[in-house]
Amino acid sequence: MMFDITKQFSLVGKVALVTGAAYGIGYAIAKAYADAGAKIAFNCRSQAHMDKALADYKKDGIEAHGYICDVTDEEAVRAMAADIEQKLGTIDILVNNAGIIKRIPMLEMTTEDFRKVIDIDLTAAFIVSKAVLPGMLRKGHGKIINVCSMLSEVGRETVAAYTAAKGGLKMLTKNIASEYGDRNIQCNGIGPGYIATPQTAPLRTPGHPFHEFLLSKTPAHRWGTPEDLMGPAVFLASDASDFVNGHILYVDGGILAYLGRNPKG
């Protein structure tokens, strides 16, 4: 019997929930899953974002099911997961993508600011995973993909809460893989580098010191795009990654591998 590698990457018949998928990275991942054959559900927090997202999905030929849901609200998340299961079937693929960043020097950051980032970027992934895992366990298979960051590995000024949250998300990923791997659950992470999204717009102005710094530190010598994450996300959601567990796949243009150019040549 011939082995068809293309079938390993198919998501036909799968149900995927992508949090924070109204635009940017989440939207690109949801679109990739739809292109690979999955049924798509997503959430966002405002009606304005929902209306635009549904119009964008429709324009791209995708029938997406949208929910206005605060992913830090356990009751709302459980209700969303139950509704998805009733309408689309058991959730096979969960992408914990919802997140925020606050760029504030640590000594100027309030505890409230710190907690808000932790709640949305880390605690929400725990809440949504906890709501979705029982269905995956009943079905005997599931994929959880946590959108981590290159800042899961390294620090940088003004983003103490974000690095703490993303470092924690990396370890939550490994723990879920360790705890449920024997029940055919694969939990992995994607660690984007600096991606051209609305969150990074203030840093991407040509001539901005950080823009020039980033290009000098990235072997690919460019900002990433949401589309750069589509292939890796499909891989981690597909049967092709069934023996990959607890791994963080960094999609960063090589920045974590690069110490910098020797000024002496």
Model features per residue range: what roles?
Residues S129, A165, T173:
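Active-site helix of classical SDR
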Residues P134, S178-D182, D242:
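Alpha-helical segment proximal to the catalytic Tyr-Lys
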